[in-house]
Amino acid sequence: MKLPIYLDYSATCPVDPRAAEKMMQCLTLDGNFGNPASRSHRFGWQAEEAVDEARNHVADLIGADPREIVFTSGATESNNLAIKGAAHFYVKQGKHIITCKTEHKAVLDTCRHLESEGYEVTYLDPQSDGLLTLPQIEAAMRPDTILVSIMHVNNEIGVIQDLAAIGELCRARKILFHVDAAQSAGKVEIDVDAMKIDLLSLSAHKVYGPKGIGALYVRRKPRVRLEAQMHGGGHERGMRSGTLPTHQIVGMGEAFRIAKAEMAEENVRIKALRDRLYDGLKDIEQVFVNGSTEHRVAGNLNISFAYVEGESLMMALKDLAVSSGSACTSASLEPSYVLRALGLNDELAHSSIRFSIGRFTTAEEIDYAIGLIRDSIGKLRDLSPLWDMYKEGIDLSKVEWVSH
């Protein structure tokens, strides 16, 4: 077993060797290196063929038509293109957007930008388990609502929203439905037709593909129109100009093909490892799982260890690659905004650790992690005066602290 152990698959995944192998064949002179937009020679035709094959694999995973797949640089760009693109195109129909407070920053900050352009955004509060209810979303809808943007699986707490019900509601009200599926593709079944999704953002590196490539699903029937955010040669049906990176697209296609073939079997194995990890930790005193345990992606376990600082625990767990909050925001020392939105106090939010398990995690690694975590929690609590006070039965919420 090699140290450190990687338990941060929600931040990124290593590229599957099968996808990496395919990518290597699209880089050098003796490989498929051409520009897919070069129509006048074989190098271009072969590259275009490879891109088309990958596009089919991406479409297959979500039940889409390949013509509905637009390649982008990743889910952040896809979210920007979907939300800004739809908001700008349909501005005459209204300027109201609905989203959730626990969305990824790529959605929240895009919405904030639109607010500066005069759009109105309703940010819904999730329930304490991280899920939204249908009446909540329906109550927020107005005659001028043009878009609802809700993520499928949350990147921090792994909860799965009921997209089919939300899609049904949006379609009945003739409101566009955008889904950030960066964390769910390859882990949870997605059917864009059955779920009545109009726009769906995808990322390759969360599905064991390369970084720097993603896609946006844009429905053709009923047709969804977007205003391009990137202008140039008119690639990707005018929605996203720029030379297509054949090697990255091929890597993404192969990763999505593997995901479709192996997802069901892989989920059983990963969920067993996740349960093994939780079973090894659940009898520690004052340990809380954040987010719904029932509606949850297989590889995610987000736990708060009361009376232990998340940052100090991460330092103690230097042999484990885990995160406190998401990688995109964990550089700040603020408590997770996702956990705050669930109603957790600052102390519990600060004491949270996200473990995310993936394709290459082993039972041996999980057992090692359990031992290390239990040992570290014990040592850190021994150093904590707050833990001593808690053990003495003092209600810390009633203590009046004196500032110096």
Swiss-Prot record:
Main localization of the protein described in the UniProt heading: cytoplasm
The cofactors named for this UniProt entry are: pyridoxal 5'-phosphate
Pathway(s) per entry: Cofactor biosynthesis; iron-sulfur cluster biosynthesis
Q: What is its EC number?
A: 2.8.1.7
Q: Which residues bind [2Fe-2S] cluster?
A: C328
- Residues modified as N6-(pyridoxal phosphate)lysine are K206
Query: Which Gene Ontology BP terms does the record give?
Result: [2Fe-2S] cluster assembly
Q: Which organism is it from?
A: Tolumonas auensis (strain DSM 9187 / NBRC 110442 / TA 4)
Disulfide bonds, which pairs? none
Q: Which GO terms describe its molecular function?
A: 2 iron, 2 sulfur cluster binding; cysteine desulfurase activity; metal ion binding; pyridoxal phosphate binding
| Function, in words | Master enzyme that delivers sulfur to a number of partners involved in Fe-S cluster assembly, tRNA modification or cofactor biosynthesis. Catalyzes the removal of elemental sulfur atoms from cysteine to produce alanine. Functions as a sulfur delivery protein for Fe-S cluster synthesis onto IscU, an Fe-S scaffold assembly protein, as well as other S acceptor proteins.
Q: Which reaction does it catalyse?
A: (sulfur carrier)-H + L-cysteine = (sulfur carrier)-SH + L-alanine
Please give the subunit comment from the record. Answer: Homodimer. Forms a heterotetramer with IscU, interacts with other sulfur acceptors.
The protein's name in its UniProt record = Cysteine desulfurase IscS
Q: Which residues form the active site?
A: C328 (cysteine persulfide intermediate)
Q: What residues bind pyridoxal 5'-phosphate, as annotated?
A: A75, T76, N155, Q183, S203, A204, H205, T243
Q: Which domain of life is it from?
A: Bacteria
Report the GO terms under cellular component.
Answer: L-cysteine desulfurase complex
Keywords, comma-separated and alphabetical: 2Fe-2S, Cytoplasm, Iron, Iron-sulfur, Metal-binding, Pyridoxal phosphate, Transferase
Keyword match rRNA processing: no
Name a Pfam family for this protein: Aminotran_5
Mind telling me which PANTHER family this protein's record contains? CYSTEINE DESULFURASE, CYSTEINE DESULFURYLASE FAMILY MEMBER
Signal peptide (from-to)? none
The family line of this record is: Belongs to the class-V pyridoxal-phosphate-dependent aminotransferase family. NifS/IscS subfamily.
Where would you find this protein in the cell? Cytoplasm
